[in-house]
């Protein structure tokens, strides 16, 4: 409010404001989730609900929306490979920083590493992906995501069908990158290529199935503040954990 008149934040030309706002909302949810994680595992404040199914559902909701939306937005722009390199490098930075300063909360193959890899693979394979009808690609990607979802438990399957995978697949860091992590593997944030690449591709094909003409309704902003966060999600993601940790550390000293 300035001089009695309200001002609205401008949405950059060409942006689909509601997509930015959805990403911003998911980012806020993720920040709150990570704040709870820090309180539990770094500051010893136990929360039964967070350790149980409600916390699990919250975490899955955040990552499903984030990855599906990233896949949906992948066809925007003409520099998917460049974006993939940038996001992958940001993931490598997170890994390096956590290994040095927070080895107990280290992040190996986290969401940024995954998203960067998914963008690079999609950019390379896009000539082939474009040959698949969007509705078919969406359906196949969704089914493959469901089939591969339990890969971390040692099997794949759907409904009554279940195929146990050989334990030799779950061998080392290399196999963990693809989704087959051994028992000794630990990461505070982990997304292997399987099953999450198929969720990313489901978003990619959902974009193609919807079409740009039907997306015009998404240009109208509802909450510009969330839109700003969505447009700067990579920077905010890199900064949020140090800020949250600093705030919680200060609170611990003040209220000790």
Region roles according to the model:
Residues 1-256:
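Alpha-helical transmembrane segments and their immediate juxtamembrane cytosolic regions
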